[in-house]
From Swiss-Prot:
It holds the Pfam family CsbD. Belongs to the UPF0337 (CsbD) family. It comes from Gloeobacter violaceus (strain ATCC 29082 / PCC 7421). This is UPF0337 protein gsr0040. InterPro entries: CsbD (IPR008462), YjbJ_sf (IPR036629). Residues 1-62 are annotated as: Disordered. Residues 1-15, 27-62 have a biased composition (Basic and acidic residues). It comes from the Bacteria.
């Protein structure tokens, strides 16, 4: 299990949310989109780690 990878993904998600909110607050659509993109990246990283964990569990049960 990649706890470090999950922590990095969570940090990226929080950073993306903050960046999106700041972009909204300052009426900067580019900054908002960059924040949303970071959140999508973080979500993908979490899903990747979920799949890796599931694969390890499946292998352990064989």
């Amino acid at each position: 299990m990649g706890i470090d990878k999950r922590a990095e993904a969570t940090a990226k998600d929080v950073q993306g949310k903050a960046q999106e909110a700041w972009g909204d607050l300052t009426d900067d659509p580019k900054l908002e989109l960059e924040g949303k993109a970071k959140q999508v990246e973080a979500s993908a990283e979490h899903k990747k780690e979920d799949l890796k964990d599931q694969a390890h569990r499946t292998i352990d049960n064989v």
